[in-house]
């Protein structure tokens, strides 16, 4: 193909084909996906068996979409089973290693030390490991700061992608993300289709602005379903602009009470059919039925 790779991307490809283990890191829009796809193609040409994995179901799904290859969660890659004592154990370990010649892990910043330890124990002798992620992201919820610590150890090759490509430069989200990473304040007066800043004087005004954006303005401007396409984030739980109050406000406007729809009250929270909920734990055994009768497997976070 006529694919163009920047110098640091070419360096990453060469390193991936020559080193036993490497880290590929860089912020959004720096070409990590293009680099990974190039590496996968060359590894396939060498007839090597490849596995792709990520720490969460959503990250694995995204990895599958952008590479065109199946990606699994690390737990599924290692094959989680219940022991006779009821504990979760991995069937792939030192005694039963993974069969792959190359394993590519994405979103490494989200992996804690316990999961990384289990993964490394399951890698067969002579296999190649490629770790990809953004070192500037928050560390894992569990113990450890894997990608940062490995980079600081200076024991394996690290390729840092810094160049923001032209297509990514058109996204103000990506531009501002890099500004923040470099300690610069974004220009909040500049508005674009994917980033704009609205200032309100009170938390109550902020909450109603969020509701109006969610229910009316964003769906109308972008022709999207607010339930499936818009996610509201708040830095706090409490207060008029916190997640608890915002959830109640949005529910009252988007999914109000209807005697024809069942609802259940748990404490101070009312759940209704049609509410948007957050799945916080992967469940590979759960089968869900779609309206047309087809079955689908798994619910992932």
Language model feature labels by segment:
Residues 1, 15, 132-298:
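Conserved helicase motor core of P-loop NTPases
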Residues 3-18:
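N-terminal pre-P-loop "Q-motif" helix
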Residues 4, 82-91, 259-261:
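Short gly/ser/thr-rich secondary-structure transition/capping motifs
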Residues 23, 38, 42-48, 54-66, ...:
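Conserved helicase motor core of SF1/SF2 NTP-dependent helicases
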Residues 29:
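Walker A (P-loop) phosphate-binding loop of P-loop NTPases
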Residues 32:
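Conserved lysine of the Walker
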Residues 92-93, 118, 266, 295:
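A structural connector/turn signal
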């Amino acid at each position: 193909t006529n694919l163009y790779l920047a110098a640091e991307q070419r360096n990453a490809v060469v390193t991936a084909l020559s080193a036993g283990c490497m880290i590929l890191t860089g912020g959004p829009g720096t070409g990590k996906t293009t680099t990974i796809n190039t590496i996968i193609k060359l590894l396939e040409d060498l007839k090597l068996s490849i596995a792709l994995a990520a720490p969460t179901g959503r990250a694995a799904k995204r990895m599958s979409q952008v590479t065109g290859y199946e990606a699994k969660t690390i737990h599924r890659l290692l094959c989680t089973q219940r022991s006779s004592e009821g504990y979760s154990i991995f069937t792939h370990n030192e005694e039963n290693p993974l069969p792959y010649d190359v394993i590519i892990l994405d979103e490494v910043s989200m992996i804690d030390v316990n999961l990384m330890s289990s993964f490394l124990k399951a890698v067969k002798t002579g296999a190649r490991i490629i770790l990809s992620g953004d070192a500037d992201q928050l560390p894992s919820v569990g113990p450890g700061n894997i990608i940062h610590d490995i980079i600081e150890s200076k024991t394996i090759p690290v390729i840092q992608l810094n160049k923001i490509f032209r297509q990514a430069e058109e996204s103000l989200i990506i531009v501002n993300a890099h500004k923040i990473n470099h300690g610069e304040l974004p220009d909040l007066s500049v508005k674009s289709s994917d980033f704009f800043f609205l200032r309100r004087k009170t938390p109550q005004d902020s909450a109603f602005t969020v509701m109006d954006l969610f229910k009316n303005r964003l769906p109308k401007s972008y022709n999207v379903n607010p339930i499936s396409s818009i996610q509201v984030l708040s830095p706090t739980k409490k207060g008029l602009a916190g997640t608890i109050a915002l959830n109640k406000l949005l529910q009252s406007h988007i999914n109000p009470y209807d005697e024809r729809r069942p609802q259940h009250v748990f404490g101070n929270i009312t759940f209704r059919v049609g509410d948007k909920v957050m799945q916080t734990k992967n469940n590979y055994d759960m089968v869900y039925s779609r309206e047309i009768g087809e079955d689908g497997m798994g619910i992932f976070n």
